[in-house]
Amino acid sequence: MLKVDSKLDYKVADISLADWGNKEMQLSEREMPGLMSIREKYGKEKPLKGLKVMGSLHMTIQTAMLIETLHALGADIRWASCNIFSTQDHAAAAIAANGTAKVFAWKGETLEEYWWCTEQALTWPDGSGPDLIVDDGGDATLLIHHGVKAEKDASILDEKTDNKEFQCVLDRLKLSVAETPGKWTAIAEKVRGVSEETTTGVHRLYQMQEAGELLFPAINVNDSVTKSKFDNLYGCRESLADGIKRATDVMIAGKVVVVVGYGDVGKGCAQSMRGFGARVLVTEIDPICALQAAMEGFEVCTMANAVERGDVFVTCTGNYHVITGEHISKMKDEAIICNIGHFDNEIEMGYLENSKTAKKIEIKPQVDKWVMESGKSVIVLAEGRLVNLGCATGHPSFVMSNSFTNQALAQIDLAKNEYEPKVMILSKKLDEEVARLHLERLGVELDVLSKEQADYISVDVEGPYKPDHYRY
């Protein structure tokens, strides 16, 4: 079991990649106008000065730009990735070499290494924890909350589980609680708040809030319009195809692509695949989303109906086992399976991994062919984890500037204000400001309401222009 070394400055794959990372970061500046504006606006004020910020978010070039922004605002930063395959090693090297943050991330971590990186990023040299957290998927938040529970009742660490990753969490905490009693309670007490990036992480936060277990304030960045309607939709519309094509070189045109789930992510994925000429099937459990898909011209059917027809399967739900072992056994020979929702449990990977008869053949990193007893095979991308980050480089810089500008504003908000432990969202005014910061880069000009027009629809000339309940 790896032990935390709070005096370690970084652990990355190859520090010599820093120059490459810095050049790509410079290339991203023009594509990330929101973050650059935040630096310009708040750089002198330094609202995060004296505050410790921990990040658990994909260590990509775009995230490096967010880290540089938080550093420019005065933060003392430690960082880990939130996915074992999503780190861009040159981005991690650049941040480590620049001294912008203490980074613990590399592509291809084991699960044990992943959770070590998370605890390592949560532990400052004096043994203290962060004031603020930037989370993606809720893993940093989960580790703290489960650590606090374990310090109250160590027996929970002896729970039996078939989930390999959760077993790593229990093992990590067992070592931590034994070596540093009271560590997690002390960390939780000092956290001013967390800003959460994803649908999955937000779902976890609301579950904890409803159970009365949320230990510190949380800002739901995911449900900012300039995040969910842009990152989730337009980001996935580009990065899904990037991941599939880099991994397999498959011709998408003419293929049957099954998109599992038609939320914002699923909408982007379905549009992407149709744009490449695929025949797209959508599966849904929500009648509203199903109706939306049908009205967009997609065939909507059950998984039972789609499973024998699909050439490519994409899970977009954030749910559990939406592709089961039974589904996998009925798929066409060499059907491609991938996930762009969040965790690897959207696909029942245990059906393949625990099988005594299925044989795994690695084609190349993050592309595995599983040959089943029947003689048929399936091709699984990124071991069922995020295909756009495991097999490509994630969303483009411009759309991530939307998301990360929200993250920076959320961190400033949590730094300046003290809140009750509950889940909040950023104001509509800030949401509109994030959008406004990105218009010039696209050559967009806005009309302006007259005073009479503003009065007529009961808004201010400067906005916000829509009520909170408006659905974009």
UniProtKB/Swiss-Prot annotation:
<feature type="binding site">
    <location>
        <position position="197"/>
    </location>
    <ligand>
        <name>substrate</name>
    </ligand>
</feature>
<feature type="binding site">
    <location>
        <position position="231"/>
    </location>
    <ligand>
        <name>substrate</name>
    </ligand>
</feature>
<dbReference type="GO" id="GO:0006730">
    <property type="term" value="P:one-carbon metabolic process"/>
</dbReference>
<keyword id="KW-0378">Hydrolase</keyword>
<dbReference type="Pfam" id="PF05221">
    <property type="entry name" value="AdoHcyase"/>
</dbReference>
<comment type="pathway">
    <text>Amino-acid biosynthesis; L-homocysteine biosynthesis; L-homocysteine from S-adenosyl-L-homocysteine: step 1/1.</text>
</comment>
<feature type="binding site">
    <location>
        <position position="232"/>
    </location>
    <ligand>
        <name>NAD(+)</name>
    </ligand>
</feature>
<protein>
    <recommendedName>
        <fullName>Adenosylhomocysteinase</fullName>
        <ecNumber>3.13.2.1</ecNumber>
    </recommendedName>
</protein>
<dbReference type="GO" id="GO:0033353">
    <property type="term" value="P:S-adenosylmethionine cycle"/>
</dbReference>
<dbReference type="InterPro" id="IPR036291">
    <property type="entry name" value="NAD(P)-bd_dom_sf"/>
</dbReference>
<comment type="function">
    <text>May play a key role in the regulation of the intracellular concentration of adenosylhomocysteine.</text>
</comment>
<feature type="binding site">
    <location>
        <position position="227"/>
    </location>
    <ligand>
        <name>substrate</name>
    </ligand>
</feature>
<dbReference type="GO" id="GO:0005829">
    <property type="term" value="C:cytosol"/>
</dbReference>
<comment type="similarity">
    <text>Belongs to the adenosylhomocysteinase family.</text>
</comment>
<dbReference type="Pfam" id="PF00670">
    <property type="entry name" value="AdoHcyase_NAD"/>
</dbReference>
<feature type="binding site">
    <location>
        <begin position="198"/>
        <end position="200"/>
    </location>
    <ligand>
        <name>NAD(+)</name>
    </ligand>
</feature>
<feature type="binding site">
    <location>
        <position position="136"/>
    </location>
    <ligand>
        <name>substrate</name>
    </ligand>
</feature>
<dbReference type="InterPro" id="IPR015878">
    <property type="entry name" value="Ado_hCys_hydrolase_NAD-bd"/>
</dbReference>
<feature type="binding site">
    <location>
        <position position="319"/>
    </location>
    <ligand>
        <name>NAD(+)</name>
    </ligand>
</feature>
<keyword id="KW-0554">One-carbon metabolism</keyword>
<dbReference type="GO" id="GO:0071269">
    <property type="term" value="P:L-homocysteine biosynthetic process"/>
</dbReference>
<dbReference type="InterPro" id="IPR042172">
    <property type="entry name" value="Adenosylhomocyst_ase-like_sf"/>
</dbReference>
<dbReference type="GO" id="GO:0004013">
    <property type="term" value="F:adenosylhomocysteinase activity"/>
</dbReference>
<feature type="binding site">
    <location>
        <begin position="340"/>
        <end position="342"/>
    </location>
    <ligand>
        <name>NAD(+)</name>
    </ligand>
</feature>
<feature type="binding site">
    <location>
        <position position="284"/>
    </location>
    <ligand>
        <name>NAD(+)</name>
    </ligand>
</feature>
<keyword id="KW-0963">Cytoplasm</keyword>
<feature type="binding site">
    <location>
        <position position="60"/>
    </location>
    <ligand>
        <name>substrate</name>
    </ligand>
</feature>
<feature type="binding site">
    <location>
        <position position="388"/>
    </location>
    <ligand>
        <name>NAD(+)</name>
    </ligand>
</feature>
<feature type="binding site">
    <location>
        <begin position="261"/>
        <end position="266"/>
    </location>
    <ligand>
        <name>NAD(+)</name>
    </ligand>
</feature>
<dbReference type="InterPro" id="IPR020082">
    <property type="entry name" value="S-Ado-L-homoCys_hydrolase_CS"/>
</dbReference>
<dbReference type="InterPro" id="IPR000043">
    <property type="entry name" value="Adenosylhomocysteinase-like"/>
</dbReference>
<keyword id="KW-0520">NAD</keyword>
